[in-house]
Each structure stands twice: as C-alpha cells, then as structure tokens.
UniProtKB/Swiss-Prot annotation:
Gene that encodes it: dapA
Protein's pathway: Amino-acid biosynthesis; L-lysine biosynthesis via DAP pathway; (S)-tetrahydrodipicolinate from L-aspartate: step 3/4
One Pfam family here: DHDPS
Catalytic reactions of this protein: L-aspartate 4-semialdehyde + pyruvate = (2S,4S)-4-hydroxy-2,3,4,5-tetrahydrodipicolinate + H2O + H(+)
Site (Part of a proton relay during catalysis): 44, 107
Family indicated by similarity: Belongs to the DapA family.
Organism encoding this protein: Laribacter hongkongensis (strain HLHK9)
Binding site for pyruvate: 45, 203
Compartments in which it is found: Cytoplasm
InterPro entries noted in UniProt: Aldolase_TIM (IPR013785), DapA (IPR005263), DapA-like (IPR002220), Schiff_base-form_aldolases_AS (IPR020625), Schiff_base-form_aldolases_CS (IPR020624)
Residues at the active site: 133 (proton donor/acceptor), 161 (schiff-base intermediate with substrate)
Domain of life of the native organism: Bacteria
Keywords: Amino-acid biosynthesis, Cytoplasm, Diaminopimelate biosynthesis, Lyase, Lysine biosynthesis, Schiff base
Name of the molecule in the record: 4-hydroxy-tetrahydrodipicolinate synthase
Key word Cytoplasm present: yes
C-alpha cells in the first residue's frame, strides 16, 4: 500500500496558457528529492477540467517519463461520462501510470447505485489499480461510506481519496474498510487528525509548496507521534487554509510562481490570484519559512 504524502501536482503553464513541460519535469524532480510518496497528475489541482484530452494524456506521459520508476504516478482519469472515464483509465495504463484517481461523476448527479455501477465498469475495463475520489463540494454528488465499502470488494479498487473534511465519516471508514484498502484525505487542514485516527496518507495541495514538510508530517502522524506531527503541522496551518482562499489551484499556482518554480500561466475560467489573496498566501509562505 502507498502511504504518506501524495502531491496533487499542478500543471505548470506559460502565460499564454500552454503547458510548460520543462517546469513540470522540474517539479517531478523536486518531489522525488523532497520525499513525496506519489504524484497525482491531472486531478483537480492539475486543472484537468481545462485540458483537452490530448493535453491531459501528454501530461500523464510526461510525468511518467520523468518519474522513470523513481516515484509512483497516479493519473487523474475521472469523467462524468462512464465511457470517457474508461477510455482515460485505459490510456493511463498504456502510458505507464501506476494507478488512477477516478472522481465521482459531476454535474449529472448519479444515485448511489449509479456511482457503484460507474466505478465497477471502470474497474472491470482494465487491471490498473483505481483510487476512488469523493469531493462533493465540486461534484454536487456525495458517495456514502456504504457505497465505498461495496466498491472496496472489487479487487482493483484499492482506495479512496475523501475530500469531505468530515473526520467522523473518515474514521468510520478506517474501522469498517478492509485493512488493505488505502484511505487518503484530500483535505490538508484535517490531514494530521485523519492519519492519527488511522488514515494512510493525504493527497495534498500544500505538498506542492512544502513537500518535505508534508512528507515528514505524514511519517510522524502515521507513526502516532502526536508531538512531532503537531510541531511540523503548526507552521503549515496558514497554507492549509489560504491555499484555498480562492478556487484551487489559483492560490497554489501563484505560490509556486512566487517561489520561482513555475511561470504565471493559468487557464480561463480560472484567473490569476487577486491582490488580497496574494497578501494572504505570501504571509502563509513566510510563516512556513518557504520564502
């Protein structure tokens, strides 16, 4: 099982909106050097919704190539069309991704049975390991724990990214899910508590700017070292909050630009971080000793 800090990596772009593959290569190296456990490419933070399918697959291929087996690569492969999600999943496997992250279908608001059949069809279409992704704040459809547990019975559905920030439901899954079913939080602010209650890691936005610290936090929390986890987490609290002061990934892309790691590009309908947001993120970066 893959545990620890998995970065929900941004997709660097030039100011004209084209993907900056050289900057992407540098970010992959940065995470390998910093102890990140895995790279989640073209998810929410990677602006998958703003990429054409061809670009989406080019980013997956680039991350796999640069990783070169040095770090696990999880490819975002979700869609609100089951057929499209199957195609993305198969292509991700062909390109060499180790696992895929598959989001609950958005906009069309499926029932729990619809979610179950959607993910079952994806899993049965290929043998690549699938991580489910529940983020009702974006999809407007919330997959309940009972549905997750039904899906956990399918051999290549291996885990869940829960981005609800609901610790009670996460801890319920820790108690009820198979022991080899990976449970990741998608909420940096509650990640420490989630891992202390038995979660296996975090798919993190904060790790984009603080990969070493997030990797250390995960090691401490998973080991049950509360004091060490708090010591590492406290300076990151501002980032956990203010990297969401506007829609993700607007703040984190600005933060990486401020740190000199990527250019300023972001795609419409997302726009550059506001002046007020820049002040907040700047202060959070300073509090974490990152600038």
């Amino acid at each position: 099982m893959l545990t620890g800090s998995l970065v929900a990596i941004v997709t660097p772009m030039l100011e004209d909106g084209s993907v900056d593959f050289e900057a992407l290569d540098r970010l992959v190296d940065f995470h390998i050097e910093s102890g990140t456990s895995g790279i989640v490419a073209v998810g929410t933070t990677g602006e998958s919704a703003a990429l054409a399918v061809e670009e989406h697959l080019q980013v997956v291929a680039a991350v796999v190539k640069r990783a070169a087996g040095r770090i696990k690569v999880i490819a975002g492969a979700g869609a609100n069309s089951t057929h499209e999600a199957i195609d993305l999943t198969r292509e991700s496997r062909r390109l060499g991704a180790d696992q895929v992250l598959s989001v609950v279908p958005y906009y069309n608001k499926p029932t729990q049975e619809g979610m179950y059949r959607h993910f079952r069809a994806i899993a049965e279409s290929t043998d690549i390991p699938v991580i489910l992704y529940n983020v009702p704040g974006r999809t407007v459809a919330d997959m309940c724990n009972d549905t997750v547990l039904r899906l956990a019975e399918i051999p290549n559905i291996i885990g869940l990214k829960d981005a609800t920030a609901d610790l009670a439901r996460c801890c319920d899954l820790v108690k009820r899910a198979p022991k080899d079913f990976a449970l990741y939080t998608g909420d940096d602010a509650t990640a420490m508590a989630f891992m202390l209650c038995g979660g296996h890691g975090v798919i993190s936005v904060t790790a984009n700017v603080a990969p070493r610290q997030m990797a250390e936090l995960c090691r401490a929390a998973i080991a049950g070292d509360v004091q060490a986890a708090r010591r590492i987490n406290d300076p990151l609290q501002g980032l956990h909050k203010d990297l969401f002061c506007e829609a993700n990934p607007i703040p984190v892309k600005w933060a990486l630009e401020r740190m000199g790691r990527i250019p300023a590009g972001i795609r419409l309908p997302l726009t550059r971080l506001s002046d007020a947001g820049q002040s907040k993120v700047e202060a959070a970066l300073k509090a974490a000793n990152l600038i």
